[in-house]
């Protein structure tokens, strides 16, 4: 049917003003639609016990993707499953906005045949594999179809609209499959950047930015040893896909580095798989990094609640808790940090100065080296907290460390550092509890007749139960010792968040977003930009919890739980 129309269409091309449909626009549109749709769904999910059935947690379109593909991302549910947010009008607004320029109507043209998967893949860094003429990345979008005939009608409709917009079309039968594509043989070269090719293969509609992308997808299907499923790294990664994952991303890290023009430094990990799982409270994003090297966790997995958390108040804005910091610098987490920061920023020091500026300032002002002066003697449980400070923009802090044989020497070392920085280390009684205070004492004179002495406490610490407790001020320590305030462990928000994290694990990083965003926006200006990009998510975010829970050799597995209203 389509070939008969092409000649008439091409004769009136010059009279048409309809804009062309560009694959980059379609890809960006689909990604945006999925992210906004899912984020909006999270909002609704927190108010209604809706469940989504995931039929298959492994992307079926992987059979079309090369084993050397840098990246593949898949939505594994039908977008209609997310349309519960239709009550807020968001889904219709987003689809109408994204597809407006394409003259494609989602309800009539796509919805009738779309099944339970949409996959986007970067298939190759350079389509013609000739770097001398520049690099042109190959992109493939695969949409699962329940009705191949209707999806073929959609494909013909899509290319008919492109023909009416002024594009010359070509049709080729490749290995038994009809491939429709933009034919730029007589067109300007720059238009190739906006080209589109498509085919219906088995139960998928394939769209690519070049006919060669579609042809290679067909090759990968017919020669299974070429496709991603035959990759040992991918096979190992898919074993880590979370149950009921609604979306999955696979990254070939060396190829991602080449694609982005980065040299993969400190290359411990060679692949990553990310899964997104919904529950009644929010979203769990689980990530697994894989390596053939031997890696070790920073500490033995913890299957019981961390006792040091009992001393953190319910109002804690940020909590970091775990065990054994002494091995952190040699752990799997440290190797991942080095690989990521060295690749992107050149080295870890540059990354720390840019991303963790507040920590750098603390080290410089106190003359500290965290690894040598603190981490080395923390071999038991620990908990670190930041608390909102109504009297100052600088938050209060708490550091709790379990008693171990190394603790006495570690405390003495910190007291010595405080003394060398000019602070007075003195003992005082606080409700019959012996406390050591780091105090900055200054004296000023008035008219040579009187002298005023001002003492500012920079930190205090004391032994309590089986822990040493450090705080930024006496008021915070007094509240802990009185045991009249509720513990963070009694905070329903915190309790619900850590319940989602698998056990055993390496501990938690817990951020109460509602209670801490003002603190971190002041300290990390980049966070404001991130918040704008993820506005649908951040608008409804209560807290986020990060944990690591690797259980198999050669893997580093962890998750981030976004708790939503």
Feature names for model-found ranges:
Residues 99-104, 169-170, 226-228, 234-237, ...:
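Short, surface-exposed, polar/charged, turn-prone segments marking secondary-structure boundaries
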Residues 43, 49-54, 97-102, 158-160, ...:
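A short linear-motif detector with a strong N-terminal bias
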Residues 4, 11-42, 53-57, 190-192, ...:
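Leucine-rich, highly hydrophobic segment in Treponema pallidum outer-membrane-associated proteins
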Residues 344, 399, 529-533:
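C-terminal/domain-terminus segments
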Residues 19-29, 34-168, 176, 251, ...:
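Structural boundary/hinge residues at secondary-structure and domain interfaces
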Residues 73, 112-235, 375-497:
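Single conserved position on a long alpha-helix in the C-terminal lobe of the eukaryotic protein kinase
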Residues 81, 149-151, 214, 257, ...:
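Residue-level signal for secondary-structure boundary sites
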